[in-house]
């Protein structure tokens, strides 16, 4: 470990000066504000603006997190894809509750979605899978996600084997690969503010409308 006299994480701090978030800035529907912020993150050329931290819980109440890419969103929910044998997919099969966090650090912003998941239909999954680059399709066949392997070479050898196998024609959709739709009922927007007086607003679904409240930082 580094000597604390040389490096102390408590000394790492900065002021948040990119502006605030006011009630007048909000939209009636949280997805409209999310889309605005996402487009601004893309315009600012943030790396991986669609990257989100996906949190799930196992049967013992132990939370797990990982970064996953958002692939679609609309009023029905937010969509991502994964190996159905993965840890997150197995946990969601037991407990569909989920949290998504978009960490747009360079804009001093974050957005948190809370909700439950539902599996996508085979037709929806096939439509997206068919749009992926061929090497990515083959990669989906290679990895038994979250399983233990002896070395990276195991994956690379399997990839080359399958690349040869699928050299001609289309790569079929693996039966163990699918997607989830997050049906959200709570969305929180956070904007960094001066003197640690950050702006937070939470949307909570109320039948066909959204209740909006400001939260203390």
Swiss-Prot record:
Its cofactor is FMN. Its EC number is 1.4.3.5. FMN binds at residues 66-71, 81-82, 87-88, 110, 145-146, 190, 200. SUPFAM superfamilies: FMN-binding split barrel. One of its GO terms (molecular function) is FMN binding. Substrate binds at residues 13-16, 71, 128, 132, 136, 196-198. Binds 1 FMN per subunit. The keyword Oxidoreductase applies. Keywords: Flavoprotein, FMN, Oxidoreductase, Pyridoxine biosynthesis. It catalyses: pyridoxamine 5'-phosphate + O2 + H2O = pyridoxal 5'-phosphate + H2O2 + NH4(+); pyridoxine 5'-phosphate + O2 = pyridoxal 5'-phosphate + H2O2. It holds the Pfam family PNPOx_N. InterPro entries: Pyridox_Oxase (IPR000659), Pyridox_Oxase_CS (IPR019740), Pyridox_Oxase_N (IPR011576), Pyridoxamine_oxidase_dimer_C (IPR019576), Split_barrel_FMN-bd (IPR012349). Disulfide bonds: none annotated. Pathway: Cofactor metabolism; pyridoxal 5'-phosphate salvage; pyridoxal 5'-phosphate from pyridoxamine 5'-phosphate: step 1/1; Cofactor metabolism; pyridoxal 5'-phosphate salvage; pyridoxal 5'-phosphate from pyridoxine 5'-phosphate: step 1/1. GO terms for biological process: pyridoxine biosynthetic process. Catalyzes the oxidation of either pyridoxine 5'-phosphate (PNP) or pyridoxamine 5'-phosphate (PMP) into pyridoxal 5'-phosphate (PLP). Homodimer. NCBIfam families: pdxH (TIGR00558), PRK05679.1 (NF004231). Belongs to the pyridoxamine 5'-phosphate oxidase family. This is Pyridoxine/pyridoxamine 5'-phosphate oxidase.
